[in-house]
Regions:
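Short, charged interaction patches at domain edges and termini
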Residues: 1-22, 125-135, 184-238
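Short amphipathic alpha-helical segments
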Residues: 5, 9, 157-168, 172
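Extended low-complexity, serine/threonine- and proline-enriched intrinsically disordered segments
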Residues: 9-16, 46-52, 165, 169
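Small/polar beta-strand repeat architecture
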Residues: 22-33, 40-45, 52-102
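Short beta-strand micro-motifs in enzyme catalytic cores
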Residues: 33-36, 67-70, 136-138, 218-222
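Short, solvent-exposed beta-alpha or beta-beta edge segments that form flexible loop/patches at the rim
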Residues: 51, 88-156, 200-218, 234-236
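Short beta-strand-to-loop capping motifs
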Residues: 73, 144-147, 224-228
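Acidic, metal/cofactor-coordinating or nucleic-acid-engaging core segments within structured domains
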Residues: 165-191
Length: 238
């Protein structure tokens, strides 16, 4: 049996966050290419996000909290009874490869954020005791990021996004805590806030560097040890 990888585990947790952002549509009002979806739950969806309706990715133009979501699309949504969030997105790997994935095939990168970004796992602690329930404990660095307008935003504006991403990080930790075969209930984690975040790499010399990720990003970083039980390798991620 193939081992379940850490990135598969974390992707599953992020999928649960996305699945929790699904709600019924009580009625639909059409006005040309705009559709007002009356719904009792809007969660953290904002203008500029994309949501899924009838399998179509549609652009959000207005949100009235827990009342309605207005979207723009050329597709017919008049029969819609449910909407689903497309966020948060999940990216894993080294920064260069992730940036290439995010920017590939789309000029509209609003569809790619907010996101949970996980760097490659470099360090794990393994148990050699046969009686130990824990298989190994990877140390994870996760970034919860959304786009921000650096040039026109005040520090207070940026920290509204930081606070929103901290809420998402805490939601992630809570979901991780109820994931079978994971033992983080008694763990601590470090959290760093980034009003302006980027990853710098050295290109041709130590005097020259380049910031990766082609978007202005704001959010939080967490570092946490995640004890994973041996039983996970004989189970499904359900």
């Amino acid at each position: 049996m193939a081992r379940i990888t850490v990135e598969t585990l974390i992707k599953n947790v992020v999928d649960k966050l996305r699945a929790s952002r699904t709600a019924a549509i009580s009625s639909v009002v059409q006005n040309g290419n705009e559709y007002t979806l009356n719904t009792l739950k809007t969660f953290d969806i904002e203008k500029g996000n994309f949501i899924s309706v009838l399998g179509f990715s549609v652009y959000v133009v207005e949100v009235v909290e827990n009342v309605s979501i207005k979207v723009e699309t050329s597709n017919d949504l008049t029969t819609a009874v449910e909407w689903e969030a497309l966020q948060p997105y999940f990216y894993y790997g080294d920064p260069i490869d992730m940036n290439n994935e995010i920017t590939a095939g789309s000029n509209d990168q609003d569809t790619k954020y907010p996101a949970v970004i996980m760097f490659e796992v470099k360090r794990s602690k393994y148990s050699i005791q046969r009686s130990d329930l824990i298989d190994f404990t990877p140390r994870l660095r996760l970034f919860f990021m959304d786009q921000a307008n650096y040039s026109d935003s005040t520090i207070n504006d940026l920290y509204k996004t930081v606070d929103s991403m901290q809420d998402l990080a805490e939601e992630f930790i809570n979901q991780l805590g109820i994931t079978p075969h994971i033992y983080v209930q008694d763990s601590d984690y470090n959290l760093n806030k980034h009003s302006k975040w980027g990853v710098k790499v050295i290109r041709s010399s130590r005097q020259q560097s380049e910031t990766l990720f082609d978007n202005n990003l704001t959010g939080v970083e967490i570092e946490i040890d995640v004890p994973i039980a041996k039983s996970l390798q004989f189970s499904c991620l359900c």
